[in-house]
Amino acid sequence: MRHWEAATNNPDDPSKPFADLMVGYPKVIFSRTNQTVSGINATMATKPIVEAIQELKQQDGKDIIAYGGAGFVTSLIENGLIDELNLFINPTAIGEGLTIFSGKTPFELDNSTRYGCGIVVNKYVPVK
């Protein structure tokens, strides 16, 4: 969050337009280690992930974007809380990693977007 907040104050930063959006959005933070959060429009979740996300999905408003590690994303998938899954495929081999799928979770490809830097974003939706 600090990066985006700093970028909003720098008119020469090429990421400023995106930073302005990111800083303006409300953010709910889930953490196993931190109990407090600082940042513009940021609050610390007070409920377990599944319960908190279910409540957020019931609120009026726009889409929810969830960024997180493998455990976080796995819990969303396992509990049917994903309406759309965007997988960013980066052409860098790391050799190892954590899976976000713990069982059979049917998704179907909605579309793919290729970017000049080599990254491909595959958008999947759950099979209902």
Annotated model-derived regions:
Residues M1-K128:
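Enzymes that bind and transform nitrogen-containing heteroaromatic metabolites
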